[in-house]
């Protein structure tokens, strides 16, 4: 795991929602994320450590209210944790580099993987493939 900034540094540099989601395993309200409707070509990175997580070509509209992807950039980019909270059985996804909470993965996505990586915008930074512009979720 990468060296992660201290909680004080993160609180100073992140919005309340970004801190809540990435550090406290929170979930942003559905249909509110800044990157939900982003359709530009580029790469979605971890907001905390900037590790690449998802290519825009794997993003799709699942209708669930959070950015959805069917595949990460690599197996190493995501860490999978069994999550039994809230009376449900789910698989939590975290950044494979810094362990920031991203969201959950579900087995109801499109082909070719059949998986839906349901990710909080607040855990992501998008880098535009054409002009390099960065947008924090």
Swiss-Prot record:
Its cofactor is Zn(2+). The keyword NADP does not apply. GO terms for biological process: protein repair; response to cadmium ion; response to oxidative stress. The active site is at residue 118. Its EC number is 1.8.4.12. GO terms for molecular function: iron ion binding; L-methionine-(R)-S-oxide reductase activity; peptide-methionine (R)-S-oxide reductase activity; zinc ion binding. It catalyses: L-methionyl-[protein] + [thioredoxin]-disulfide + H2O = L-methionyl-(R)-S-oxide-[protein] + [thioredoxin]-dithiol. Binds 1 zinc ion per subunit. The zinc ion is important for the structural integrity of the protein. This is Peptide methionine sulfoxide reductase MsrB. Zn(2+) binds at residues 46, 49, 95, 98. InterPro entries: Met_Sox_Rdtase_MsrB (IPR028427), Met_Sox_Rdtase_MsrB_dom (IPR002579), Mss4-like_sf (IPR011057). The gene is msrB.
């Amino acid at each position: 795991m990468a060296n992660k900034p201290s909680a004080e540094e993160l609180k100073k540099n992140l919005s309340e929602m970004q801190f809540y989601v990435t550090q406290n395993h929170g979930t942003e309200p559905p249909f509110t994320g800044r990157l939900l409707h982003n359709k530009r070509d580029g790469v979605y990175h971890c907001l905390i450590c900037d590790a690449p997580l998802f290519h825009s070509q794997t993003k799709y509209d699942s209708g669930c209210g959070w950015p959805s992807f069917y595949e990460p950039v690599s197996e190493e980019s995501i860490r999978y944790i069994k999550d039994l909270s809230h009376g449900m059985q789910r698989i939590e996804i975290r950044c494979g580099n810094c362990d920031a909470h991203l969201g959950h993965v579900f087995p109801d996505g499109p082909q070719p993987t059949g998986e839906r990586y349901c990710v909080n915008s607040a855990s992501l930074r998008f880098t535009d493939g054409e002009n390099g512009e960065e947008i924090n979720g």
